[in-house]
A protein has these predicted regions:
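Non-transmembrane, aqueous-exposed alpha-helical and coiled segments at domain scale
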Residues: 1-207
Length: 207
């Protein structure tokens, strides 16, 4: 069943893209996100357009990488997982993930990076592997059309704010600055995904 929070967040996504001349219901666009398909906000949100190209996502358990997804194939697989009880990214059919992608546990020591993942996330080609924390930060900072946050925690602050000011110690290691975001649009489906000053800094840098 469709959650109202996701629907509201998606209406704002459509409006922001419309202002840039992009119709998210008819044009393919790239997305990174926080959440998984069992979550209300993320799961519902990632089914609100059949043109989503979800290149990377993470939740508290896994990191999902699909650097060159087929919109129709990935939409159908996300829908299948959404309808499974208590699903996780591990339920995603590995055969449907594009070359260079995969699903990795957040507890891994390090995650090897393929050329495809580095290109999709805008990571220096010389880097061969990242820790899960480093990779999740790279996902948040990826040069995509949309960063869709359906997670719990504050992931974006202003560069002149300290982590202590944010008051969310659990997310300190993942948090980035508004000036570091390279996405065109941020959708805050989660609660307090960015500090207000982080939003302002992102907007001042063209977001």
């Amino acid at each position: 069943k469709m959650g109202i929070t996701a629907k509201g967040a998606w209406e704002s996504v459509k409006r922001h893209f419309r202002e840039m001349g992009i119709n998210t219901q008819t044009t393919d666009f790239t997305v990174v996100g926080i959440g998984d398909m069992s979550g209300d906000v993320f799961g519902n949100g990632m089914l609100l357009s059949q043109h989503i190209r979800l290149v990377a996502a993470f939740d508290h358990r896994h990191i999902f990488l699909d650097p060159n997804p087929d919109p129709a194939v990935s939409f159908a697989e996300r829908k299948r997982i959404f309808e499974l009880p208590r699903s996780s990214w591990e339920d995603y059919n590995a055969k449907l993930i594009s070359a260079g992608g995969g699903v990795f546990p957040r507890g891994a020591k390090s995650i090897p990076l393929t050329a495809e993942v580095k290109a999709a996330l805008g990571i220096d080609p010389a880097i061969e592997a990242l820790t899960p924390i480093e990779l999740m930060r790279a996902i948040i900072k990826a040069p995509v059309d949309l960063f869709y946050n359906g997670g719990i925690g504050t992931y974006v602050k202003a560069s002149y704010q300290s982590h202590a000011e944010v008051g969310d110690r659990a997310t300190d290691a993942l948090r980035v600055n508004g000036s570091e975001l390279r996405c065109k649009v941020v959708a805050e489906g989660g609660n307090l995904g960015c500090t207000q000053l982080g939003r302002v800094e992102y907007a001042l840098h063209g977001g």
